[in-house]
């Protein structure tokens, strides 16, 4: 029987850290050590360029003028849009206006389904890649897409796998290069939560009180003991209101933005935090930039990741307040044991799906290497298949 190791599952609160080094938001990670993780993929000449091109103040790069064409499905006013705008402003502010971005908001150039092909083909220079719809191509990104422990922990987890660990980063970045891509950072994605129409006090009463759990990802929640009804996010408000489902789980931010607090009174964070939306650049475009320009773009991506972490920590607090004011109930706080059980379900379900995705393409062994590191980083005692 697989068991969780002891996790230090402390919610990362308001942090005054420099940058998140991993994949959670649109930059590198939040700690000083992880802040350079995205930059770790840059060549040694890129690293030296960073010091040689910065001004005496250390934050202005002497670069020839250049432009990046950026496509995003986010609107400028959304959290994701604010993160991208930070990247744009950083480039301009740290190049005396010589680095500019031609930004296309709201999927006007490429929608979610098209943005991978768009950046891979060079139709656009950069995207904030929502990788989940593209796992059939980017197989090695199918590892569990969130982690326990808070915003910073999720970023550190993604950064370790994508940038810092020599074995896993070689697999993930190598696959990106095969598709003419380079990942620059990871962007924070916020907390995940349960909501229900019935009262519960812990994981046991959450599961036992449910007659119909609405979600598209049945494997995780069936592992926990729920009876799952397939319901998409766009239909969940109505399903909760009409009693077709009595409970669900998703990212806290979209749950609140879609108003589920109006039809579900009882809420709890599930202890996991998301990351992703890697700032991804066309590899040919990256190679066409000078070492100085590359150093600036990487620094902007690193700084943006840090910014995204703080933005999402603040957003989590604000969303919790919104829900509690609307429902009149405080969030249930799960015990460490409950959070361990939830993470076990997530890891087992996602690991099985990841291996099934990779095996037909001859990538099973590589994915097992990634999953072993993912388990190590999150403190989960995982036994790989056939071991």
Predicted feature residues:
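Short, solvent-exposed loop/beta-turn-alpha elements that line the ligand-binding surface or hinge
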Residues: 151-178, 355-359
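N-terminal secretory/targeting leader peptides
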Residues: 24-30, 54-156, 182-387
